[in-house]
Curated annotation (Swiss-Prot):
This is Glycine N-acyltransferase-like protein. Coiled coil: none annotated. Pfam families: Gly_acyl_tr_C (PF08444), Gly_acyl_tr_N (PF06021). The modification N6-acetyllysine is found at residues 41, 43, 48, 80, 83, 183, 256. Gene3D superfamilies: 3.40.630.30.
């Protein structure tokens, strides 16, 4: 195991991961932001260097003091050879299997290795598998070969429908809005998730629409992997196209900073899939995967 400490190594890792997109997307996005100042204080581990087989990005040990905090204890994994990464992923210094944790990857073929390891270490696993999208400008830059339909090449053509700009004002979230975001997040609902959301709001760009009362009615955030996440709309304002307006605004804000932009949605969420089609988000040939692991 090797911890890539130098900025030169991390830049090399980012360049290398780019060659394996879109399967490396979750790790590529994380390493990209590590090279933008590493605000989440993450570290990148590889099995060998420079010709690595598997890379794991995780928090530093001192950040992982709460064994029950799955939102902090999160690992992003990419492997060129998922069938031969068991030994590396089983190393205690790579993944602390004694904690409640999350593993995220754009590779569904890591499932067998993760399930085998979890069984051997007496860990219960819940897997979430979703549709992965890349925004058109990012896809044009990073994976132009996936843009078979020319409509994706015109970023302006995938606009949301107009909203009442007298009623709704575009703004950014404040850390005091974390409880509201957490209330409507499917992975939220507790103190730890709320703390994670607050951290994301403090560090990364966010977007929201303020309603007539001056409070957020629709919003979207960015997490430490560079993904648009935790988007939501309060029930009274749903079915008005607000979320598509917010996702579009958040995408533009991230595009302007030169960030790669991507997101995911559940396979059963036809409303968001329709929105993604309208905004010309590019569906990836690989999935968004998360494994929630809890020691038995």
């Amino acid at each position: 195991m090797l911890h890539l400490r130098s900025s030169q190594m991390l830049q090399m890792l980012e360049s290398s991961l780019r060659k394996y997109l879109p399967e490396s997307l979750k790790v590529y996005g994380t390493v990209f932001h590590m090279n933008q100042g590493n605000p989440f204080k993450l570290k990148a581990l590889v099995d060998k260097w420079p010709d690595f087989n598997t890379v794991v990005v995780r928090p530093r040990e001192q950040e992982m003091g709460d064994d029950l905090d799955q939102h902090t204890n999160t690992y992003q994994i990419y492997s060129k050879d998922p069938k031969h990464c068991l030994e590396f992923l089983g190393t205690p210094d790579v993944i602390n299997w004694k904690q409640h944790l999350q593993i995220q990857s754009s590779q569904s073929n890591l499932n067998e290795a993760i399930m085998d390891l979890a069984a051997g270490k007496m860990v219960k696993v819940k897997r979430t598998q979703c549709i992965l999208y890349m925004m058109p400008e990012t896809a044009k830059k990073l994976v132009p070969s996936l843009l078979e339909d020319k409509e994706y090449l015109d970023h302006q053509s995938g606009r949301p429908r107009a909203i009442d700009q007298e009623m709704f004002k575009l703004s950014t979230l404040d850390v005091t809005h974390a409880p509201l975001v957490d209330k409507f997040w499917q992975f939220g609902g507790n103190e730890r998730s709320q703390r994670f959301i607050g951290r994301c709001i403090q560090i990364f760009p966010s977007s929201c629409l303020l309603g007539p009362e001056g409070t957020p009615v629709s919003w979207a955030l960015m997490d430490q992997t560079g993904e648009i996440r935790m988007a939501g709309t309060v029930p009274d304002y749903r079915a008005q196209g607000l979320i598509s307006h917010i996702i579009y605004a958040q995408t533009l804000a991230m595009d302007k900073r030169g960030y790669p932009v991507y997101n995911h949605t559940e396979q059963t969420n036809k409303v968001i899939q329709k929105m993604s089609h309208t905004l010309h988000h590019v569906p990836m040939p690989c999935d968004w995967n998360q494994w929630y692991c809890a020691p038995l």
